[in-house]
């Protein structure tokens, strides 16, 4: 099991369904925190390290995969140009016209599709939809779903084709 004060993984726990649930629940929390932090970064323009530090101080991270939160936050910022370039052909709007919450969700999901091939594309899409339901506008989750459904085959062509067989 991943202990609360380290990010060490014990392989024995990988066999346990409870461990898998715990890991995915902690990743879901990391995605939620990262979405909020990315929104703040986009809106306020504060330094990423300051935002990360603030989130770690102001929030209970005992149920958050802290390393994944950091990877998502910094990964989106570092790869923003690549992410936006991948997203743009799947949008009916420009990046600047997007709702900031949906933009944060789409950037996070696109980062996972591009850089975290260990996370199945269907999980990425589902998590993006759930984030948009929680934080986005009334029908934001439908918009996010539509964009990610267009994006996944472009970024994960082999995986998507294999799944559709």
From Swiss-Prot:
Biased composition (Basic and acidic residues): 10-21
Keyword Magnesium: no
GO cellular component, one term: cytosol
Record-level Gene Ontology MF annotations: RNA binding
Region annotation Disordered: where it falls in the sequence: 1-27
Keywords annotated in UniProt: RNA-binding, Transcription, Transcription antitermination, Transcription regulation
Superkingdom of source: Bacteria
Stretches assigned to coiled coil: none
S-adenosyl-L-methionine among keywords: no
GO terms, biological process: DNA-templated transcription termination; transcription antitermination
Family the entry assigns: Belongs to the NusB family.
UniProt function note: Involved in transcription antitermination. Required for transcription of ribosomal RNA (rRNA) genes. Binds specifically to the boxA antiterminator sequence of the ribosomal RNA (rrn) operons.
Protein name: Transcription antitermination protein NusB
Organism, as annotated: Pseudomonas savastanoi pv. phaseolicola (strain 1448A / Race 6)
Gene name of the encoded protein: nusB
């Amino acid at each position: 099991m991943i202990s609360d004060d380290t990010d060490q993984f014990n392989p024995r726990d990988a066999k346990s369904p409870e461990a898998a649930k715990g890991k995915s629940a902690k990743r879901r929390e990391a995605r939620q925190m990262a979405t909020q932090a990315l929104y703040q970064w986009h809106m306020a323009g504060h330094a990423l390290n300051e935002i990360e530090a603030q989130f770690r101080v102001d929030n209970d991270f005992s149920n958050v995969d802290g390393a994944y939160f950091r990877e998502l936050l910094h990964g989106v910022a570092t790869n923003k140009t690549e992410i936006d370039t991948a997203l743009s052909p799947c949008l009916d709007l420009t990046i600047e016209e997007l709702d900031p919450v949906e933009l944060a969700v789409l950037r996070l999901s696109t980062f996972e599709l591009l850089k975290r091939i260990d996370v199945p594309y269907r999980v990425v899409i589902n998590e993006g939809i759930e984030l948009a339901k929680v934080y986005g506008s009334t029908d934001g989750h439908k918009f996010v779903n539509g964009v990610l459904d267009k994006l996944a085959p472009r970024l994960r062509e082999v995986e998507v084709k294999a799944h559709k067989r």
